[in-house]
């Protein structure tokens, strides 16, 4: 059995590896959008190839899974069987879906608190941070959708500001 320091190190590392892997995957798949919205990113600038980003994503996810398998069973369920598939599905299918992508990203950030709590067998203290992370991340994701509206429109994404309008978005934020 791992002591608390090892569990904390493993859970923190898994969250970092998964986040980096998911970002690399998203960058590889968002290449065309980033040409418009974020042309200063490494892939549009040609510093990193799409294949290179996909390879890095795969490696980071694999290392994250390997570490996750050392944790208690419920943490493995959250890390390997819930969070990992959601991260990949978000990047491949859900990103531009009306509010669904925003909810998935928000859930994933909130779930990281649950993941740590389950790993330490102390879930209750993590419920409030989990809910706060979900709510604040959801607002942040909608704000990001407005900032990315030009590129998202050009590729036919169905984000909240595109479907409901920027005025509707402003009412939610305020």
Spans of model-derived segments:
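Intramembrane alpha-helical segments
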Residues: 43-128
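A cytosolic-side transmembrane-helix exit/cap motif
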Residues: 27-34, 97-105, 122-129, 146-153
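Non-catalytic, surface-exposed connector residues within folded enzymatic/regulatory domains
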Residues: 3, 36-37, 79, 97, ...
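Membrane-embedded alpha-helical segments that form the functional core of polytopic membrane enzymes
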Residues: 2-29, 61-65, 76-88, 123-143
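Solvent-exposed interhelical
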Residues: 14-63, 135-174
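Detector for Asparagine
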Residues: 3-4, 23-26, 37, 93, ...
């Amino acid at each position: 059995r791992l002591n608390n320091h090892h569990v904390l190190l493993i859970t923190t590392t898994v969250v970092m590896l998964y986040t980096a892997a998911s970002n690399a995957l998203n960058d590889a798949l968002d290449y065309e959008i980033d040409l418009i919205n974020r042309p200063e990113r490494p892939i549009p600038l040609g510093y990193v190839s799409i294949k290179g980003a996909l390879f890095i994503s795969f490696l980071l996810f694999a290392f994250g899974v390997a570490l996750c398998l050392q944790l208690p069973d419920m943490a493995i369920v959250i890390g390997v069987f819930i969070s990992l598939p959601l991260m990949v599905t978000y990047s491949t299918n859900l990103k531009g879906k009306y509010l669904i992508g925003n909810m998935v990203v928000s859930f994933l950030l909130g779930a990281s608190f649950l993941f740590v709590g389950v790993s330490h067998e102390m879930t209750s203290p993590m419920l409030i941070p989990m809910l706060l992370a979900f709510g604040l991340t959801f607002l942040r994701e909608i704000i990001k959708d407005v900032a990315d509206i030009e590129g998202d429109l050009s590729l036919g994404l169905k984000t909240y500001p595109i479907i409901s309008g920027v005025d509707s978005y402003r009412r939610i934020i305020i």
